[in-house]
Regions:
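RNA-contacting regions in translation and RNA-metabolism proteins
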Residues: 1-141
Length: 141
């Protein structure tokens, strides 16, 4: 795994989130009006809170859309977590021309959800998977 560098803005967002939720954050990415938090394994419940109270409180404080991804040391599990509610049939990771590529099998009815508006979901997945598991590309099948 490559070293993750955080901007001072990200460090502030992490400190705010951790102080408001008691969840531990592994990474933070600020991207186009949204903040993506990678939550340590097992802390997702604390991050969300009862009835979503914690995440809603953080959202009001930062005035941006908040997305949470639960971290996993296992790349396949992490990729599934990064896709959120999308049903993933399978994930295969292989080397192609010297690059690590994850092939994600998604049902055709959920492919649009996996891609997201203007490709925002697939780009998010590619970004976090690259940062945490050195996977160069994610391809939907």
């Amino acid at each position: 795994m490559s070293e993750i560098r955080l901007s001072t803005e990200c460090v502030r967002y992490i400190a705010l989130f951790e102080s408001m939720t008691d969840a531990s954050i592994k990474d933070c990415i600020i991207d186009d009006g949204r903040v993506i938090y990678v939550v340590n394994t097992g802390d997702m419940g604390a991050a969300i809170g009862k009835r979503g109270d914690n995440i809603n409180r953080v959202k009001r404080s930062v005035d941006k859309h908040i997305e949470l991804i639960e971290y996993s040391d296992e790349p396949v599990t992490f990729i599934k977590n990064a896709f959120g509610t999308v049903s993933i049939k399978s994930v295969k990771i292989s080397n192609k021309d010297g690059n690590k590529v994850a092939y994600v099998d998604v049902s055709s009815s959920e492919k649009g959800l996996a891609i997201g508006r203007n490709g925002s979901n697939i780009e998010k997945v590619k970004m976090v998977v690259s940062r945490h598991h050195d996977i160069d590309d994610v391809i939907l099948e």
